[in-house]
Design a protein with these regions (language model features):
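Surface-exposed binding/hinge segments that line
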Residues: 42-44, 222, 333-334, 344-411, ...
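Secretory targeting signatures
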Residues: 1-78, 537, 547, 609
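Detector for C-terminal structural segments
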Residues: 26, 64-65, 96-106, 127-256, ...
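Structural transition elements
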Residues: 82, 91-99, 430, 567-605, ...
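Short, well-ordered beta-strand elements
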Residues: 80-91, 116-118, 243-255, 309-314, ...
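Aromatic- and charge-enriched surface segment that lines or borders ligand/interaction sites
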Residues: 295-351, 385, 488, 539, ...
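Aromatic-rich, solvent-exposed beta-strand/loop patch
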Residues: 91-94, 237, 387-406, 421-484, ...
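N-terminal lobe/hinge region of extracytoplasmic solute-binding protein
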Residues: 249-304, 425
Length: 615
Protein backbone atom coordinates (compact mmCIF):
# COMPACT_ATOMS: atom_id res chain seq x y z
CA UNK A 1 0.00 0.00 0.00
CA UNK A 2 1.36 3.42 -0.92
CA UNK A 3 1.69 6.29 1.51
CA UNK A 4 -0.95 8.23 -0.44
CA UNK A 5 -3.45 5.36 -0.14
CA UNK A 6 -2.81 5.03 3.60
CA UNK A 7 -3.28 8.80 3.99
CA UNK A 8 -6.60 8.72 2.12
CA UNK A 9 -7.89 5.93 4.37
CA UNK A 10 -6.81 7.78 7.49
CA UNK A 11 -8.56 10.94 6.24
CA UNK A 12 -11.78 8.96 5.76
CA UNK A 13 -11.59 7.76 9.35
CA UNK A 14 -11.06 11.30 10.63
CA UNK A 15 -13.92 12.62 8.47
CA UNK A 16 -16.22 9.95 9.85
CA UNK A 17 -15.29 10.88 13.39
CA UNK A 18 -15.85 14.59 12.75
CA UNK A 19 -19.28 13.89 11.27
CA UNK A 20 -20.20 11.76 14.25
CA UNK A 21 -19.63 14.82 16.46
CA UNK A 22 -21.63 17.32 14.26
CA UNK A 23 -25.00 18.70 15.55
CA UNK A 24 -27.98 16.60 14.44
CA UNK A 25 -30.66 18.32 12.31
CA UNK A 26 -34.41 17.72 12.62
CA UNK A 27 -36.26 16.58 9.50
CA UNK A 28 -38.37 19.09 7.58
CA UNK A 29 -42.11 18.64 8.28
CA UNK A 30 -43.06 19.13 4.66
CA UNK A 31 -40.51 16.71 3.34
CA UNK A 32 -39.01 19.43 1.19
CA UNK A 33 -35.52 19.12 2.61
CA UNK A 34 -35.45 22.49 4.38
CA UNK A 35 -33.28 22.70 7.47
CA UNK A 36 -35.07 22.61 10.79
CA UNK A 37 -33.89 24.27 13.93
CA UNK A 38 -31.16 22.47 15.84
CA UNK A 39 -32.42 19.98 18.33
CA UNK A 40 -31.25 20.79 21.81
CA UNK A 41 -29.25 17.85 23.02
CA UNK A 42 -30.11 16.13 26.25
CA UNK A 43 -27.92 17.02 29.18
CA UNK A 44 -24.74 14.85 29.32
CA UNK A 45 -23.79 12.85 32.31
CA UNK A 46 -20.74 14.20 34.15
CA UNK A 47 -17.50 12.97 32.46
CA UNK A 48 -19.28 12.00 29.26
CA UNK A 49 -17.24 14.33 27.08
CA UNK A 50 -13.99 12.82 28.38
CA UNK A 51 -15.25 9.32 27.66
CA UNK A 52 -16.15 10.39 24.14
CA UNK A 53 -12.62 11.62 23.50
CA UNK A 54 -11.19 8.39 24.89
CA UNK A 55 -13.36 6.47 22.44
CA UNK A 56 -12.27 8.71 19.57
CA UNK A 57 -8.57 8.26 20.41
CA UNK A 58 -9.04 4.50 20.72
CA UNK A 59 -10.73 4.38 17.32
CA UNK A 60 -7.87 6.37 15.80
CA UNK A 61 -5.25 4.05 17.30
CA UNK A 62 -7.07 0.96 16.07
CA UNK A 63 -7.41 2.50 12.61
CA UNK A 64 -3.72 3.42 12.41
CA UNK A 65 -2.64 -0.03 13.61
CA UNK A 66 -4.93 -1.67 11.11
CA UNK A 67 -3.68 0.44 8.25
CA UNK A 68 -0.01 -0.13 9.24
CA UNK A 69 -0.56 -3.87 9.57
CA UNK A 70 -2.13 -3.99 6.13
CA UNK A 71 0.80 -2.01 4.74
CA UNK A 72 3.35 -4.43 6.23
CA UNK A 73 1.42 -7.48 5.08
CA UNK A 74 1.12 -6.07 1.59
CA UNK A 75 4.87 -5.40 1.44
CA UNK A 76 6.06 -8.97 1.84
CA UNK A 77 9.17 -10.33 0.16
CA UNK A 78 8.72 -10.02 -3.61
CA UNK A 79 8.12 -13.16 -5.61
CA UNK A 80 11.32 -12.55 -7.56
CA UNK A 81 14.62 -11.28 -6.23
CA UNK A 82 16.87 -9.64 -8.81
CA UNK A 83 20.65 -9.79 -8.92
CA UNK A 84 23.32 -9.23 -11.58
CA UNK A 85 25.87 -11.92 -12.44
CA UNK A 86 28.97 -10.58 -14.18
CA UNK A 87 31.49 -12.54 -16.23
CA UNK A 88 34.50 -11.91 -18.45
CA UNK A 89 33.79 -11.80 -22.19
CA UNK A 90 37.18 -11.59 -23.92
CA UNK A 91 38.67 -15.03 -23.36
CA UNK A 92 40.59 -14.57 -20.12
CA UNK A 93 39.20 -17.93 -18.98
CA UNK A 94 38.69 -19.30 -22.47
CA UNK A 95 35.53 -19.53 -24.53
CA UNK A 96 33.42 -21.21 -21.84
CA UNK A 97 32.52 -18.16 -19.73
CA UNK A 98 29.24 -17.37 -21.45
CA UNK A 99 28.11 -20.99 -21.16
CA UNK A 100 29.20 -21.03 -17.52
CA UNK A 101 27.27 -17.84 -16.75
CA UNK A 102 24.17 -19.15 -18.54
CA UNK A 103 24.32 -22.45 -16.65
CA UNK A 104 24.62 -20.65 -13.33
CA UNK A 105 21.80 -18.31 -14.28
CA UNK A 106 19.59 -21.29 -15.08
CA UNK A 107 20.36 -23.20 -11.88
CA UNK A 108 19.75 -20.15 -9.68
CA UNK A 109 16.58 -19.10 -11.50
CA UNK A 110 15.17 -22.63 -11.59
CA UNK A 111 14.46 -22.36 -7.87
CA UNK A 112 11.85 -19.76 -8.75
CA UNK A 113 12.63 -16.94 -6.34
CA UNK A 114 15.62 -15.23 -7.97
CA UNK A 115 16.07 -13.63 -11.37
CA UNK A 116 19.62 -13.27 -12.63
CA UNK A 117 20.66 -10.60 -15.13
CA UNK A 118 23.87 -11.37 -17.02
CA UNK A 119 26.44 -8.66 -17.66
CA UNK A 120 29.98 -8.91 -19.01
CA UNK A 121 33.09 -6.88 -19.74
CA UNK A 122 36.59 -7.42 -21.16
CA UNK A 123 39.20 -8.33 -18.57
CA UNK A 124 40.86 -4.92 -18.21
CA UNK A 125 37.48 -3.31 -17.46
CA UNK A 126 36.31 -6.30 -15.44
CA UNK A 127 39.28 -5.99 -13.09
CA UNK A 128 38.48 -2.33 -12.47
CA UNK A 129 34.83 -3.18 -11.94
CA UNK A 130 35.49 -5.23 -8.84
CA UNK A 131 37.96 -2.68 -7.47
CA UNK A 132 35.32 0.04 -7.98
CA UNK A 133 32.54 -2.13 -6.47
CA UNK A 134 30.32 -2.17 -9.56
CA UNK A 135 29.56 -5.89 -9.48
CA UNK A 136 27.38 -7.51 -6.79
CA UNK A 137 28.07 -11.09 -7.92
CA UNK A 138 30.77 -12.15 -10.38
CA UNK A 139 32.88 -15.04 -11.63
CA UNK A 140 36.59 -15.31 -10.93
CA UNK A 141 39.33 -17.92 -11.07
CA UNK A 142 42.38 -18.46 -8.93
CA UNK A 143 45.81 -19.85 -9.66
CA UNK A 144 48.10 -20.11 -6.62
CA UNK A 145 50.69 -17.45 -5.90
CA UNK A 146 52.57 -19.76 -3.56
CA UNK A 147 52.07 -23.45 -2.89
CA UNK A 148 50.57 -23.43 0.59
CA UNK A 149 46.97 -23.87 1.72
CA UNK A 150 47.13 -20.34 3.08
CA UNK A 151 47.10 -19.09 -0.52
CA UNK A 152 43.53 -20.35 -0.79
CA UNK A 153 42.53 -18.63 2.46
CA UNK A 154 44.26 -15.33 3.20
CA UNK A 155 43.89 -13.75 -0.28
CA UNK A 156 40.13 -14.35 -0.07
CA UNK A 157 39.21 -14.05 3.58
CA UNK A 158 41.72 -11.71 5.19
CA UNK A 159 40.46 -8.15 5.29
CA UNK A 160 43.23 -6.86 3.02
CA UNK A 161 42.98 -9.77 0.59
CA UNK A 162 39.19 -9.64 0.35
CA UNK A 163 39.38 -5.98 -0.58
CA UNK A 164 41.90 -6.74 -3.33
CA UNK A 165 39.74 -9.53 -4.78
CA UNK A 166 36.47 -7.62 -4.64
CA UNK A 167 34.39 -9.29 -1.92
CA UNK A 168 35.23 -6.68 0.75
CA UNK A 169 34.62 -9.36 3.38
CA UNK A 170 35.59 -8.14 6.85
CA UNK A 171 35.77 -10.57 9.75
CA UNK A 172 38.34 -9.83 12.43
CA UNK A 173 37.99 -13.30 13.98
CA UNK A 174 38.80 -14.94 10.65
CA UNK A 175 41.73 -12.54 10.30
CA UNK A 176 43.03 -13.78 13.65
CA UNK A 177 42.69 -17.43 12.65
CA UNK A 178 44.55 -16.71 9.41
CA UNK A 179 47.36 -15.04 11.33
CA UNK A 180 47.60 -18.04 13.64
CA UNK A 181 47.79 -20.62 10.83
CA UNK A 182 50.38 -18.51 9.03
CA UNK A 183 52.58 -18.27 12.10
CA UNK A 184 53.15 -21.97 12.71
CA UNK A 185 54.17 -25.21 11.06
CA UNK A 186 52.39 -27.27 13.72
CA UNK A 187 49.93 -29.45 11.74
CA UNK A 188 47.49 -29.70 14.65
CA UNK A 189 47.19 -25.94 15.04
CA UNK A 190 46.92 -25.44 11.29
CA UNK A 191 44.24 -28.13 11.01
CA UNK A 192 42.18 -26.45 13.72
CA UNK A 193 42.51 -22.95 12.26
CA UNK A 194 41.85 -23.99 8.67
CA UNK A 195 38.75 -25.89 9.83
CA UNK A 196 37.45 -22.77 11.57
CA UNK A 197 38.29 -20.58 8.57
CA UNK A 198 36.43 -22.86 6.16
CA UNK A 199 33.40 -23.11 8.46
CA UNK A 200 33.24 -19.31 8.59
CA UNK A 201 33.47 -19.23 4.79
CA UNK A 202 30.50 -21.58 4.52
CA UNK A 203 28.48 -19.61 7.04
CA UNK A 204 29.18 -16.10 5.73
CA UNK A 205 29.37 -17.00 2.00
CA UNK A 206 31.44 -14.15 0.58
CA UNK A 207 32.41 -16.72 -2.09
CA UNK A 208 30.85 -19.87 -3.50
CA UNK A 209 33.41 -22.46 -4.70
CA UNK A 210 32.28 -23.97 -7.99
CA UNK A 211 34.79 -26.29 -9.66
CA UNK A 212 38.39 -27.04 -10.49
CA UNK A 213 39.44 -27.98 -13.98
CA UNK A 214 42.39 -29.58 -15.71
CA UNK A 215 45.53 -27.92 -16.97
CA UNK A 216 45.92 -28.39 -20.72
CA UNK A 217 48.25 -27.69 -23.58
CA UNK A 218 48.86 -29.02 -27.09
CA UNK A 219 52.11 -28.96 -29.03
CA UNK A 220 53.77 -30.44 -32.08
CA UNK A 221 55.59 -33.68 -31.38
CA UNK A 222 59.05 -32.24 -31.96
CA UNK A 223 58.73 -29.86 -28.98
CA UNK A 224 60.16 -30.93 -25.62
CA UNK A 225 59.98 -29.91 -21.93
CA UNK A 226 56.43 -28.55 -21.99
CA UNK A 227 55.53 -28.74 -18.30
CA UNK A 228 52.17 -27.89 -16.73
CA UNK A 229 53.73 -26.43 -13.62
CA UNK A 230 51.52 -26.06 -10.52
CA UNK A 231 52.46 -22.40 -10.05
CA UNK A 232 54.01 -20.85 -13.16
CA UNK A 233 54.48 -21.87 -16.81
CA UNK A 234 58.15 -21.67 -17.85
CA UNK A 235 58.78 -20.88 -21.50
CA UNK A 236 62.53 -20.67 -20.92
CA UNK A 237 62.80 -24.46 -20.45
CA UNK A 238 60.87 -25.41 -23.61
CA UNK A 239 62.98 -26.79 -26.43
CA UNK A 240 62.44 -27.31 -30.14
CA UNK A 241 65.61 -29.09 -31.28
CA UNK A 242 67.11 -27.66 -34.44
CA UNK A 243 65.24 -24.34 -34.10
CA UNK A 244 66.01 -21.05 -32.40
CA UNK A 245 62.48 -19.60 -32.36
CA UNK A 246 59.43 -21.05 -30.62
CA UNK A 247 56.02 -19.88 -31.86
CA UNK A 248 53.11 -20.17 -29.45
CA UNK A 249 49.56 -18.89 -29.16
CA UNK A 250 47.15 -18.16 -26.33
CA UNK A 251 43.77 -16.54 -25.84
CA UNK A 252 44.96 -14.90 -22.62
CA UNK A 253 45.84 -11.22 -22.39
CA UNK A 254 48.31 -9.09 -20.49
CA UNK A 255 46.91 -6.64 -17.96
CA UNK A 256 50.13 -5.28 -16.49
CA UNK A 257 53.78 -6.27 -16.62
CA UNK A 258 54.70 -4.23 -13.56
CA UNK A 259 55.36 -6.68 -10.69
CA UNK A 260 53.83 -4.14 -8.30
CA UNK A 261 50.54 -4.26 -10.22
CA UNK A 262 50.19 -7.63 -11.97
CA UNK A 263 47.86 -10.10 -10.31
CA UNK A 264 46.57 -12.32 -13.10
CA UNK A 265 47.98 -15.54 -14.48
CA UNK A 266 49.13 -14.45 -17.92
CA UNK A 267 50.75 -11.21 -16.78
CA UNK A 268 52.54 -13.21 -14.10
CA UNK A 269 53.57 -15.79 -16.70
CA UNK A 270 55.33 -13.14 -18.80
CA UNK A 271 56.86 -11.50 -15.73
CA UNK A 272 58.38 -14.83 -14.73
CA UNK A 273 60.24 -15.04 -18.04
CA UNK A 274 61.57 -11.47 -17.82
CA UNK A 275 62.16 -11.02 -14.07
CA UNK A 276 63.76 -13.13 -11.37
CA UNK A 277 62.97 -13.43 -7.68
CA UNK A 278 65.11 -14.26 -4.66
CA UNK A 279 63.93 -17.86 -4.80
CA UNK A 280 62.31 -19.71 -7.70
CA UNK A 281 60.50 -22.98 -8.35
CA UNK A 282 61.83 -26.24 -9.69
CA UNK A 283 60.92 -26.80 -13.32
CA UNK A 284 58.50 -29.65 -12.53
CA UNK A 285 57.08 -29.01 -9.08
CA UNK A 286 56.72 -26.47 -6.27
CA UNK A 287 60.09 -27.21 -4.66
CA UNK A 288 62.00 -23.97 -4.09
CA UNK A 289 65.46 -23.37 -5.53
CA UNK A 290 67.86 -20.42 -5.25
CA UNK A 291 67.12 -17.64 -7.72
CA UNK A 292 68.77 -14.29 -7.10
CA UNK A 293 69.73 -15.57 -3.66
CA UNK A 294 72.64 -17.90 -3.04
CA UNK A 295 70.66 -20.18 -0.72
CA UNK A 296 67.14 -20.93 0.46
CA UNK A 297 66.91 -19.54 4.02
CA UNK A 298 66.18 -22.20 6.65
CA UNK A 299 66.65 -22.52 10.38
CA UNK A 300 69.19 -25.25 9.68
CA UNK A 301 71.50 -22.96 7.69
CA UNK A 302 71.00 -20.06 10.10
CA UNK A 303 69.33 -17.77 7.57
CA UNK A 304 65.98 -18.04 9.40
CA UNK A 305 65.97 -17.08 13.06
CA UNK A 306 64.85 -19.54 15.71
CA UNK A 307 61.60 -17.63 16.22
CA UNK A 308 60.86 -17.67 12.47
CA UNK A 309 60.64 -13.87 12.28
CA UNK A 310 63.88 -13.01 10.47
CA UNK A 311 64.88 -14.13 6.96
CA UNK A 312 68.28 -13.32 5.46
CA UNK A 313 69.17 -13.59 1.77
CA UNK A 314 72.65 -13.31 0.28
CA UNK A 315 72.56 -12.19 -3.37
CA UNK A 316 74.48 -13.94 -6.11
CA UNK A 317 77.30 -11.97 -7.63
CA UNK A 318 77.28 -10.53 -11.13
CA UNK A 319 73.52 -10.10 -11.56
CA UNK A 320 72.50 -7.16 -13.75
CA UNK A 321 69.29 -5.78 -15.20
CA UNK A 322 68.85 -5.89 -18.96
CA UNK A 323 68.54 -2.09 -19.20
CA UNK A 324 71.19 -1.99 -21.90
CA UNK A 325 73.59 -0.25 -22.17
CA UNK A 326 73.44 0.61 -18.44
CA UNK A 327 73.50 -3.00 -17.23
CA UNK A 328 72.54 -1.81 -13.74
CA UNK A 329 73.90 -4.19 -11.08
CA UNK A 330 71.44 -5.73 -8.66
CA UNK A 331 72.02 -4.73 -5.03
CA UNK A 332 70.31 -5.43 -1.73
CA UNK A 333 69.17 -1.80 -1.67
CA UNK A 334 67.39 -2.25 -5.01
CA UNK A 335 65.65 -5.36 -3.65
CA UNK A 336 64.51 -3.36 -0.61
CA UNK A 337 63.38 -0.45 -2.79
CA UNK A 338 61.37 -2.78 -5.03
CA UNK A 339 59.55 -4.42 -2.12
CA UNK A 340 58.81 -1.02 -0.59
CA UNK A 341 57.62 0.33 -3.94
CA UNK A 342 55.01 -2.43 -4.25
CA UNK A 343 53.88 -1.87 -0.66
CA UNK A 344 53.82 1.92 -0.94
CA UNK A 345 51.89 2.02 -4.23
CA UNK A 346 49.44 -0.70 -3.12
CA UNK A 347 47.87 -0.51 -6.57
CA UNK A 348 44.19 -1.52 -6.86
CA UNK A 349 43.78 -5.25 -7.40
CA UNK A 350 47.50 -5.89 -6.90
CA UNK A 351 49.24 -8.49 -4.75
CA UNK A 352 50.91 -5.90 -2.50
CA UNK A 353 48.94 -7.22 0.47
CA UNK A 354 50.94 -10.46 0.21
CA UNK A 355 53.93 -8.42 1.34
CA UNK A 356 52.56 -6.02 3.94
CA UNK A 357 49.75 -8.18 5.35
CA UNK A 358 50.36 -11.88 4.66
CA UNK A 359 54.14 -11.40 4.71
CA UNK A 360 53.99 -9.34 7.93
CA UNK A 361 56.23 -6.54 6.62
CA UNK A 362 53.62 -3.91 7.40
CA UNK A 363 52.60 -0.70 5.67
CA UNK A 364 53.23 2.36 7.80
CA UNK A 365 51.81 5.82 7.04
CA UNK A 366 54.48 7.38 9.26
CA UNK A 367 57.10 5.73 7.05
CA UNK A 368 55.78 7.05 3.74
CA UNK A 369 53.45 4.03 3.39
CA UNK A 370 56.51 1.83 3.02
CA UNK A 371 57.06 -1.25 5.15
CA UNK A 372 57.18 -0.81 8.90
CA UNK A 373 60.33 0.93 10.15
CA UNK A 374 63.08 -1.64 10.53
CA UNK A 375 61.17 -4.38 8.69
CA UNK A 376 63.65 -4.44 5.79
CA UNK A 377 67.32 -4.20 6.65
CA UNK A 378 70.00 -3.71 4.01
CA UNK A 379 72.94 -5.33 5.77
CA UNK A 380 75.37 -4.65 2.93
CA UNK A 381 75.27 -4.42 -0.86
CA UNK A 382 74.65 -8.16 -1.23
CA UNK A 383 72.74 -9.04 1.95
CA UNK A 384 69.16 -8.22 2.95
CA UNK A 385 67.25 -9.28 6.05
CA UNK A 386 63.49 -9.14 6.50
CA UNK A 387 62.28 -8.66 10.09
CA UNK A 388 58.69 -9.85 10.23
CA UNK A 389 56.07 -8.68 12.70
CA UNK A 390 55.20 -12.33 13.34
CA UNK A 391 56.38 -15.71 12.06
CA UNK A 392 55.28 -16.54 8.51
CA UNK A 393 56.08 -20.17 7.80
CA UNK A 394 55.96 -19.76 4.00
CA UNK A 395 57.78 -16.43 3.67
CA UNK A 396 60.22 -17.97 1.16
CA UNK A 397 57.25 -18.82 -1.05
CA UNK A 398 56.14 -15.18 -0.97
CA UNK A 399 59.60 -14.16 -2.13
CA UNK A 400 59.14 -16.48 -5.13
CA UNK A 401 55.99 -14.68 -6.29
CA UNK A 402 56.13 -12.02 -9.00
CA UNK A 403 55.20 -9.12 -6.68
CA UNK A 404 58.60 -9.64 -5.02
CA UNK A 405 60.60 -9.34 -8.27
CA UNK A 406 63.24 -6.60 -8.10
CA UNK A 407 62.90 -3.70 -10.54
CA UNK A 408 65.47 -0.97 -11.20
CA UNK A 409 65.18 2.32 -9.34
CA UNK A 410 64.40 3.98 -12.68
CA UNK A 411 60.89 2.50 -12.46
CA UNK A 412 57.97 4.86 -11.87
CA UNK A 413 57.93 5.49 -8.12
CA UNK A 414 54.54 7.23 -8.09
CA UNK A 415 52.45 4.81 -10.13
CA UNK A 416 52.36 1.84 -12.48
CA UNK A 417 55.23 1.30 -14.91
CA UNK A 418 54.14 1.08 -18.59
CA UNK A 419 53.97 -2.43 -20.04
CA UNK A 420 55.74 -1.44 -23.24
CA UNK A 421 58.90 -2.79 -24.82
CA UNK A 422 61.86 -0.97 -23.30
CA UNK A 423 59.91 -0.13 -20.13
CA UNK A 424 59.76 -3.69 -18.77
CA UNK A 425 63.19 -4.28 -17.24
CA UNK A 426 64.15 -7.31 -15.19
CA UNK A 427 67.05 -9.65 -14.49
CA UNK A 428 65.46 -12.76 -16.02
CA UNK A 429 66.53 -14.96 -18.93
CA UNK A 430 64.41 -13.08 -21.48
CA UNK A 431 63.79 -9.43 -22.28
CA UNK A 432 60.57 -8.26 -23.90
CA UNK A 433 61.37 -6.68 -27.26
CA UNK A 434 57.84 -6.39 -28.68
CA UNK A 435 54.44 -5.89 -27.08
CA UNK A 436 51.45 -5.16 -29.26
CA UNK A 437 48.55 -5.26 -26.79
CA UNK A 438 46.11 -8.13 -27.38
CA UNK A 439 48.10 -9.26 -30.42
CA UNK A 440 51.76 -10.10 -29.92
CA UNK A 441 54.57 -10.45 -27.38
CA UNK A 442 58.15 -11.26 -28.36
CA UNK A 443 60.71 -12.41 -25.81
CA UNK A 444 64.39 -12.50 -26.78
CA UNK A 445 67.40 -13.98 -25.04
CA UNK A 446 68.62 -11.28 -22.65
CA UNK A 447 72.21 -12.31 -22.00
CA UNK A 448 74.69 -13.59 -24.56
CA UNK A 449 73.91 -16.31 -27.09
CA UNK A 450 73.10 -19.98 -26.92
CA UNK A 451 76.74 -20.76 -27.59
CA UNK A 452 77.94 -18.11 -25.16
CA UNK A 453 75.24 -17.89 -22.51
CA UNK A 454 76.01 -15.22 -19.90
CA UNK A 455 72.77 -15.47 -17.93
CA UNK A 456 73.81 -15.68 -14.27
CA UNK A 457 71.48 -18.61 -13.43
CA UNK A 458 71.83 -20.61 -16.65
CA UNK A 459 72.61 -23.87 -14.81
CA UNK A 460 69.61 -23.64 -12.47
CA UNK A 461 68.17 -26.96 -13.70
CA UNK A 462 71.37 -28.69 -14.74
CA UNK A 463 72.13 -31.48 -15.35
CA UNK A 464 68.50 -32.50 -15.96
CA UNK A 465 68.04 -29.66 -18.42
CA UNK A 466 70.58 -27.76 -20.45
CA UNK A 467 71.46 -24.12 -19.84
CA UNK A 468 68.46 -21.77 -19.76
CA UNK A 469 66.95 -20.11 -21.64
CA UNK A 470 66.96 -22.85 -24.23
CA UNK A 471 65.34 -21.00 -27.16
CA UNK A 472 66.66 -17.67 -28.45
CA UNK A 473 63.21 -16.23 -29.07
CA UNK A 474 59.63 -16.90 -27.93
CA UNK A 475 56.89 -15.42 -30.13
CA UNK A 476 53.56 -15.35 -28.29
CA UNK A 477 50.54 -14.77 -30.52
CA UNK A 478 47.46 -13.56 -28.66
CA UNK A 479 44.31 -14.92 -30.30
CA UNK A 480 40.73 -13.75 -29.95
CA UNK A 481 39.19 -17.18 -29.38
CA UNK A 482 39.78 -20.79 -28.45
CA UNK A 483 38.76 -21.74 -31.99
CA UNK A 484 41.76 -19.80 -33.27
CA UNK A 485 44.04 -21.78 -30.96
CA UNK A 486 42.70 -25.03 -32.32
CA UNK A 487 43.26 -23.88 -35.88
CA UNK A 488 46.81 -22.79 -35.02
CA UNK A 489 47.82 -26.20 -33.74
CA UNK A 490 45.89 -28.14 -36.41
CA UNK A 491 47.73 -26.29 -39.16
CA UNK A 492 50.99 -26.15 -37.18
CA UNK A 493 51.04 -22.38 -37.55
CA UNK A 494 52.50 -22.48 -34.04
CA UNK A 495 54.46 -24.99 -32.02
CA UNK A 496 52.49 -24.77 -28.76
CA UNK A 497 49.03 -23.60 -27.69
CA UNK A 498 48.40 -22.86 -24.02
CA UNK A 499 45.33 -21.33 -22.29
CA UNK A 500 42.71 -22.13 -23.27
CA UNK A 501 41.23 -24.71 -25.63
CA UNK A 502 37.47 -25.22 -25.37
CA UNK A 503 36.28 -28.62 -24.03
CA UNK A 504 34.89 -29.82 -27.41
CA UNK A 505 38.07 -28.74 -29.22
CA UNK A 506 40.22 -30.41 -26.59
CA UNK A 507 38.37 -33.72 -27.01
CA UNK A 508 38.57 -33.45 -30.80
CA UNK A 509 42.31 -32.79 -30.74
CA UNK A 510 42.85 -35.70 -28.36
CA UNK A 511 41.04 -38.01 -30.77
CA UNK A 512 43.08 -36.81 -33.76
CA UNK A 513 46.43 -36.22 -32.03
CA UNK A 514 48.19 -39.11 -33.73
CA UNK A 515 47.12 -38.17 -37.24
CA UNK A 516 47.90 -34.50 -36.61
CA UNK A 517 51.35 -35.25 -35.21
CA UNK A 518 50.68 -33.38 -31.98
CA UNK A 519 50.66 -34.10 -28.26
CA UNK A 520 47.70 -33.08 -26.11
CA UNK A 521 48.80 -32.88 -22.50
CA UNK A 522 46.47 -32.75 -19.52
CA UNK A 523 47.41 -32.35 -15.90
CA UNK A 524 45.88 -31.72 -12.53
CA UNK A 525 45.37 -28.03 -12.01
CA UNK A 526 45.52 -26.05 -8.78
CA UNK A 527 43.25 -23.48 -10.42
CA UNK A 528 39.82 -23.02 -8.88
CA UNK A 529 36.72 -21.20 -10.13
CA UNK A 530 34.24 -19.51 -7.86
CA UNK A 531 31.52 -16.90 -7.44
CA UNK A 532 32.29 -13.69 -5.58
CA UNK A 533 29.76 -11.62 -3.66
CA UNK A 534 30.59 -8.01 -2.93
CA UNK A 535 29.22 -8.13 0.61
CA UNK A 536 28.71 -4.35 0.57
CA UNK A 537 26.26 -4.76 -2.32
CA UNK A 538 24.73 -8.05 -1.18
CA UNK A 539 24.89 -7.52 2.60
CA UNK A 540 22.20 -10.00 3.61
CA UNK A 541 23.86 -13.31 4.40
CA UNK A 542 20.59 -15.22 3.88
CA UNK A 543 20.50 -14.14 0.23
CA UNK A 544 24.07 -15.35 -0.31
CA UNK A 545 23.30 -18.64 1.44
CA UNK A 546 20.17 -19.12 -0.65
CA UNK A 547 22.18 -18.78 -3.86
CA UNK A 548 24.73 -21.25 -2.45
CA UNK A 549 21.89 -23.77 -2.06
CA UNK A 550 20.74 -23.24 -5.65
CA UNK A 551 24.07 -23.74 -7.47
CA UNK A 552 24.28 -26.97 -9.49
CA UNK A 553 27.92 -28.05 -9.94
CA UNK A 554 27.01 -31.22 -11.82
CA UNK A 555 25.28 -29.14 -14.49
CA UNK A 556 28.40 -26.98 -14.80
CA UNK A 557 30.64 -30.00 -15.29
CA UNK A 558 28.39 -31.83 -17.74
CA UNK A 559 27.00 -28.95 -19.79
CA UNK A 560 29.97 -26.60 -19.91
CA UNK A 561 33.01 -28.87 -19.54
CA UNK A 562 31.78 -32.23 -20.86
CA UNK A 563 32.47 -33.89 -17.52
CA UNK A 564 36.09 -32.74 -17.19
CA UNK A 565 35.53 -30.28 -14.32
CA UNK A 566 35.54 -31.50 -10.72
CA UNK A 567 33.05 -30.04 -8.24
CA UNK A 568 34.62 -27.79 -5.61
CA UNK A 569 33.16 -27.46 -2.12
CA UNK A 570 35.79 -25.31 -0.43
CA UNK A 571 38.09 -22.54 -1.56
CA UNK A 572 40.92 -24.89 -0.59
CA UNK A 573 40.92 -27.65 -3.25
CA UNK A 574 40.78 -31.26 -2.15
CA UNK A 575 44.38 -31.92 -3.24
CA UNK A 576 45.73 -29.37 -0.74
CA UNK A 577 46.32 -30.06 2.97
CA UNK A 578 43.58 -29.06 5.43
CA UNK A 579 40.81 -28.97 2.81
CA UNK A 580 37.28 -29.64 4.11
CA UNK A 581 34.29 -29.90 1.77
CA UNK A 582 32.20 -27.51 3.88
CA UNK A 583 29.87 -26.42 1.09
CA UNK A 584 28.98 -30.02 0.27
CA UNK A 585 27.74 -30.79 3.78
CA UNK A 586 26.08 -27.42 4.35
CA UNK A 587 24.57 -26.64 0.93
CA UNK A 588 25.02 -29.55 -1.47
CA UNK A 589 23.74 -28.80 -4.97
CA UNK A 590 20.46 -27.57 -6.44
CA UNK A 591 18.55 -27.62 -3.15
CA UNK A 592 15.79 -25.23 -4.17
CA UNK A 593 13.49 -25.85 -1.21
CA UNK A 594 16.23 -24.83 1.20
CA UNK A 595 17.09 -21.80 -0.93
CA UNK A 596 13.49 -20.61 -0.97
CA UNK A 597 13.04 -21.22 2.75
CA UNK A 598 15.95 -18.88 3.42
CA UNK A 599 14.58 -16.20 1.12
CA UNK A 600 11.24 -16.41 2.92
CA UNK A 601 13.07 -15.52 6.15
CA UNK A 602 14.50 -12.32 4.77
CA UNK A 603 12.78 -9.37 6.49
CA UNK A 604 10.59 -7.28 4.24
CA UNK A 605 12.53 -4.20 5.28
CA UNK A 606 15.73 -5.62 3.74
CA UNK A 607 16.34 -4.59 0.16
CA UNK A 608 16.91 -7.76 -1.80
CA UNK A 609 17.51 -6.35 -5.23
CA UNK A 610 21.30 -6.15 -5.48
CA UNK A 611 21.79 -4.47 -8.81
CA UNK A 612 25.01 -2.64 -9.57
CA UNK A 613 24.95 1.12 -9.56
CA UNK A 614 27.19 3.14 -11.83
CA UNK A 615 29.78 5.08 -9.90
Amino acid sequence: MTFRTRRKRLNKVLLFLRRSRAPRMASGSDGGGTLAEPVTPAPRAPGGRNRMWIVIVAILIVAIIGISTYAVLSARVPTKVGIELWYNNDGHYGDTETALALTLQNSIQSCGRVTVSLKSDPWAVYKQNWANQRMPMFLLGWYPDYFDSDDYASPFLSIAGAKSLGSFYNNSQVDQWITEEQSTVDPNIRTDRFTKIQNALADDVPYIPLFSGVAQTAYVNSVQNVELHPVVFKWFIVDKPGATVLNVSTSDKVISLDPASAYDFFSGEIINQVFDTLVVYDWKNATLKPGLAQDIPTRANGLVSADGMNYTYHLKAGVTFHDFPLNTPLTAQIVANSINRAIRLDLPGSAAFLLYDVGALGRDATNGNNSSPGAIEVVNSSTITFHLARPVSFFNDLMAFSVSAPVPDSYNQAGEQPSTAGSVIGTGPYKMTTHTPNQLIVLDRAFGTKASNTYYNKDLYSPTLGPIPIMDRIVINIRASAAALKQDIETKAVDVVFRTLSPPDLVDLQNRASSLGITVKLGSSPQIRYLVFNVNKVPNKLVRQAIAFSVDRSAISQIVFLGTASPLYSMIPAEMPYSTAVFQSKYGDARCADANNLLAQVPATIELIALARDR
